[in-house]
Regions:
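Hydrophobic (often cysteine-bearing) scaffold residues that line and stabilize catalytic clefts
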Residues: 2-6, 20, 52, 56, ...
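Basic, flexible linker segments flanking DNA-binding modules
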Residues: 1-68, 173
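Short small-residue beta-strand/loop micro-motif enriched in glycine and branched aliphatics
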Residues: 106-112, 166-169, 193-194
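An active-site-proximal beta-strand-loop segment
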Residues: 62-110, 116
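Active-site beta-loop-alpha junctions of metal-dependent nucleic acid enzymes
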Residues: 94-95, 112-136
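Charged, gly/pro-enriched flexible loop segments at helix/strand junctions
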Residues: 211-217
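Mobile genetic element proteins and their domesticated derivatives, centered on retroelements
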Residues: 9, 24, 28, 60, ...
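RNase H-like two-metal-ion nuclease catalytic core shared by retroviral integrases
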Residues: 45-47, 51, 144-146, 152-153, ...
């Protein structure tokens, strides 16, 4: 794939063979296959507003490995930009927000929502779908950063009511949720980089199609 970077190629090849990431990097370099680096602002939405509710312990503690599906789930919100004409015919920058829930077992996106506003309703839509998928498992953990939408009682109580343990990254430490950061990097490199979208519907459809491709590739 022309937009795949070293890490993505290594991950794909590792499914069928043993290969060192350094060797993958060397082969890419020798054959001049390196993709153009993604330079756009990462678009990660900073929803941290201090402690506005309950901050959970960092139970995951960067241990993203699990031998069963639907046991360790993580989430976050990221933004994408598109352009839309106003009444004067001038293009205005608009934003779209993606709220995915990712299974750490295989990095599959088990649910997501796409919205024009980064509010709790958007998160709740994806959360409800994720819980429906993981409800038959025991000792399930849902991880996130300390964003305000994950601290509020409605989110915390929904997890409790469904027997789900909540885990949160430490403040300002993106590596505590690097598995989700990696997905955001991949989707923006492969679907969003060097492309311009001119409506909410166009960008929304591109995200939907990409997540399907990502999950089924």
């Amino acid at each position: 794939h022309e937009d795949w970077g070293c890490k993505r190629i290594h991950g794909y090849l590792s499914k069928t063979m043993k290969i060192n990431i350094k060797k993958v990097h060397r082969i890419i370099k020798e054959n001049n296959l390196q993709v153009e680096t993604y330079h756009k602002k990462n678009g990660k939405l900073n929803t941290y507003k201090g402690t506005v509710g309950k901050v959970a312990d960092n139970i995951i503690n960067r241990n993203f490995k699990t031998d069963k599906a639907h046991k360790k789930i993580t989430t976050d919100t990221t933004e994408f930009k598109y352009y839309e004409k106003d009444k004067s015919g001038n293009y205005q920058t608009k934003k779209i927000y993606l709220n995915p829930f990712l299974d750490m077992f295989n990095s599959e996106i088990i649910s997501y929502s796409i919205n024009k506003r980064p509010n709790y309703k958007a998160v709740e839509e994806a959360l409800d779908k994720a819980i429906e998928i993981t409800k038959d498992q025991k000792e399930v953990i849902y991880h996130s950063d300390q964003g305000r939408l994950y601290q509020i009682p409605r989110y915390v109580n929904t997890l409790k009511e469904n027997g789900i343990t909540q885990s949160m990254s430490r403040k300002g430490n993106c590596l505590d949720n690097s598995i989700m950061e990696n997905f955001f990097s991949i989707i923006k490199q492969e679907m969003y980089n060097k492309k311009v979208f001119y409506s909410f519907e166009e960008l929304e459809q591109a995200i939907i199609e990409y997540i399907y491709y990502y999950n089924h590739k």
